């Protein structure tokens, strides 16, 4: 008989299994500091600047997002299988066009709410999903 107190343990174990089986690229390795290019999949993110890069630091569980117009850092966590990060962001005033600013704001809001990451070791790609839809891809070192 399973007691309700074990649900948190089940969710934790399922999260670990999901990340392990998906080949998620957040595992500690010598490549954890490499840059990842953010590639929009959903139309809401098409205006994200081409030079916006993302890097993970698995040692202190932080993410850095940066371009010529912005720099941001967040400590990430996993909660109920969702990847979350609340960013501290610095922008260069007047550097972004309005559409870019809206897309960047949506990106940080989505990451704060939590997303599902699905990794692929073969082609060094991470899919970022929200509500069952792929919104962005992270591609390592294009």
UniProtKB/Swiss-Prot annotation:
Location(s), subcellular: Cell outer membrane
GO cellular component, one term: cell outer membrane
Entries under InterPro entries matching the protein: MxiM, MxiM_sf
Positions of S-diacylglycerol cysteine lipidation: 24
Disruption outcome: Inactivation of the gene blocks the Ipa invasin secretory pathway and severely attenuates virulence.
Signal peptide residue numbers: 1-23
Source species, domain of life: Bacteria
Keywords, in A-Z order: Cell outer membrane, Lipoprotein, Membrane, Palmitate, Plasmid, Signal, Virulence
Covalent lipid adducts (N-palmitoyl cysteine), residues: 24
Membrane topology term: Lipid-anchor
Family, as annotated: Belongs to the MxiM family.
Function: Involved in the synthesis of the type III secretion system (T3SS), also called injectisome, which is used to inject bacterial effector proteins into eukaryotic host cells. Pilot protein that is required for the proper localization of the secretin MxiD/SctC in the outer membrane. Also influences both MxiD/SctC multimerization and stability. Required for both Ipa translocation and tissue culture cell invasion. Binds lipids.
Name of the featured protein: Type 3 secretion system pilotin
Organism, scientific name: Shigella flexneri
């Amino acid at each position: 008989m399973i007691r309700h107190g074990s649900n948190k343990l089940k969710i934790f174990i399922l999260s670990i299994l999901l990340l392990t089986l998906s080949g998620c690229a957040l595992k500690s390795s010598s490549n954890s500091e490499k840059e990842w290019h953010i590639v929009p999949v959903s139309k809401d993110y098409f205006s994200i600047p081409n030079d916006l890069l993302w890097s993970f630091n698995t040692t202190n569980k932080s993410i850095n997002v940066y371009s010529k117009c912005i720099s941001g850092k967040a400590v990430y966590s996993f909660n109920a299988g969702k990847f979350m990060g609340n960013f501290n962001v610095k922008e260069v005033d007047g550097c972004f066009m309005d559409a870019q600013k809206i897309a960047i704001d949506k990106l940080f809001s989505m990451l704060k709410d939590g997303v599902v990451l699905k990794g692929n070791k073969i082609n060094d790609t991470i899919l970022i999903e929200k509500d069952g839809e792929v919104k962005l891809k992270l591609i390592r070192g294009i």
